[in-house]
Amino acid sequence: MARDTTLFTTAYPASRLLGEFSGRLSRRSERISLLAADRNPVDEVRYFDAGRWPQHADGGGSSLELRDLDADNQLPETWAASDESHQSGWRTYSYRKRGTSNGGPNEWRDFVLGLLDAGEILLDDIRVVESPDGNAVQFLTNTSFESGATGWRMVGNHRLSRVITDPDNPGNKVLHLVSEGATEHMHNHIETTLAGGRSVNSSRVYEISFRARWLTGSNQLHTRLYFNRAAQT
């Protein structure tokens, strides 16, 4: 059963498709039953989103996949979150917004990013440029992580993030972002102080760009200038 039958058959042409799934599964817990044509039960499983169940398959990106067809699928250990590292490539993201203040605190001069749920992604070439079409000014340092994690702070449930060698390019360094839960406005994120203690100007345009590669779990990255300026997911 698949929600998008065309996409499924294109990706898995050798697999047998029984029909289209038009329902909706809960992100918390659901009981799924498989019945034969005569309505006799063939299999049944109830999944959860916590405890021993994979945290990366919680409705934010990765799917829940059975690791062994011959194992007892009632056990959480027989399930895993899908690994997207071999199916996703590097993509460049870029957006522009004014540095308009929302009335929040302005004493910190930081750039902040984090995932909206548990997950892992690779990041590189993170840039914040003020007035990109005019007198462009780069607001960040160590944007390509060639100096390791210098200048970057991994906080709270993003603390396991680290700089690693790019799996696809041994001569390149990237940030392996590892999140155990949702980012927050004061904690649970990755942050860096703006170069030279620069301030964000409410009337100026800022271009925020980066390269990213999704690995597993949530693929929703939130970026912003502190407090909540030029924010986007």
Regions found by a protein language model. Name each.
Residues 11-13, 73-80, 138-139, 187-188:
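Short, charged, solvent-exposed linker or helix-capping segments at domain edges/interfaces
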Residues 21, 51-53, 79, 90, ...:
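Tryptophan-centered motif/residue detector
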Residues 1, 45, 79, 95, ...:
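Generic structural hydrophobic/aromatic packing signal, biased to beta-strands
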Residues 83-233:
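Extracellular and organelle-lumenal recognition/adhesion modules and their flexible linkers in secreted
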Residues 2-3, 35, 69-71, 80-85, ...:
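Low-complexity, flexible helical/coil segments
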Residues 30, 65-66, 75-77, 94-98, ...:
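Short C-terminal domain-edge/linker segments immediately following a structured domain
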Residues 1-74:
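Solvent-exposed beta-edge/loop recognition patches
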Residues 15-16, 47-49, 62, 78-85, ...:
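Short intrinsically disordered coil segments
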